Swiss-Prot record:
It catalyses: 2-[(2R,5Z)-2-carboxy-4-methylthiazol-5(2H)-ylidene]ethyl phosphate + 4-amino-2-methyl-5-(diphosphooxymethyl)pyrimidine + 2 H(+) = thiamine phosphate + CO2 + diphosphate; 2-(2-carboxy-4-methylthiazol-5-yl)ethyl phosphate + 4-amino-2-methyl-5-(diphosphooxymethyl)pyrimidine + 2 H(+) = thiamine phosphate + CO2 + diphosphate; 4-methyl-5-(2-phosphooxyethyl)-thiazole + 4-amino-2-methyl-5-(diphosphooxymethyl)pyrimidine + H(+) = thiamine phosphate + diphosphate. Pathway: Cofactor biosynthesis; thiamine diphosphate biosynthesis; thiamine phosphate from 4-amino-2-methyl-5-diphosphomethylpyrimidine and 4-methyl-5-(2-phosphoethyl)-thiazole: step 1/1. Keywords: Magnesium, Metal-binding, Thiamine biosynthesis, Transferase. Binds 1 Mg(2+) ion per subunit. It comes from Caldicellulosiruptor bescii (strain ATCC BAA-1888 / DSM 6725 / KCTC 15123 / Z-1320). NCBIfam families: thiE. 4-amino-2-methyl-5-(diphosphooxymethyl)pyrimidine binds at Q45, Y46, R47, E48, K49, N77, T116, K145. This is Thiamine-phosphate synthase.
Length: 219
């Protein structure tokens, strides 16, 4: 798949999957990713804050193989070096990570670069720095990070839907019960981290989320 083809995924009504072993009720990242892929998720971000770099490398290699088998994308959180080493499709950078323009010099044009954003200025700066997409959030209160940013709210989602120069992934506190609000505000690609990884039945939860997404796609 070309880079252009990969980036089209970020503008469709779809789920951006993300690992979060801390919230996975004893299930490993590998187990969860297998279910995500088997349930139709085509973008996986490997995010792991509590393991050594060597452990992350080993897991990433295994997840890369899985994503290739399912013709899905692998985005590595934070680590441009790990992204290169495992042959991932791209890297996702936080506001405290290396600047996107410098990472672009390191990785070249073929890799996807995403940037976490909370404000209009950060979205515009990400475009200026050569990012390919942004993560926009947290839309609602979220507890997956140690020091979470205050919720940006649905008004920011509406602004991004109308004005963002880049595709965006709505993230943060998104649940099955509020997903329709997020989509009605203009989001298409969404990430519901704990709603998925913490579900008793991950496959069933993903099916429910996709059902809502498809209802908006048809409307």
């Amino acid at each position: 798949m070309t880079k252009e083809g990969k980036l089209k995924l970020f503008s469709t009504y779809t789920i951006y999957g993300m690992t979060a072993e801390k919230f996975s009720n004893g299930r490993s990242n590998i187990e969860v990713v297998k279910v995500m892929l088997d349930s139709g998720i085509k973008i996986i971000q490997y995010r792991e804050k509590y393991k050594s770099l060597k452990e992350k490398y080993k897991e990433c290699l295994e997840i890369r193989k899985l994503t290739e088998d399912y013709e899905a994308l692998l985005i590595v959180n934070d680590h441009a070096d790990l992204c290169q080493m495992v042959g991932a499709d791209g890297v996702h950078l936080g506001q405290e990570d290396l600047p996107a323009d410098e990472v672009r010099k390191l990785l070249g044009d073929k890799f996807i670069i995403g940037v976490t954003t909370h404000t209009k200025d950060q979205v515009l700066k990400a475009k200026e720095d050569g990012a390919d997409y942004v993560g926009l959030g947290p839309v609602f209160a979220s507890f997956t990070k140690d020091n979470p940013h205050p919720p940006i709210g649905l008004e920011m989602v509406k602004w991004a839907a109308e004005n963002s120069p880049l595709p965006f992934v709505a993230i943060g506190g998104i649940k099955e019960h509020n997903l329709k609000e997020v989509l009605a505000s203009g989001a298409r690609c969404i990430c519901a981290v704990t709603e998925i990884v913490g579900a008793d039945d991950i496959r069933k939860k993903i099916e429910s989320l996709f059902k809502i997404l498809k209802s908006f796609e048809r409307s």
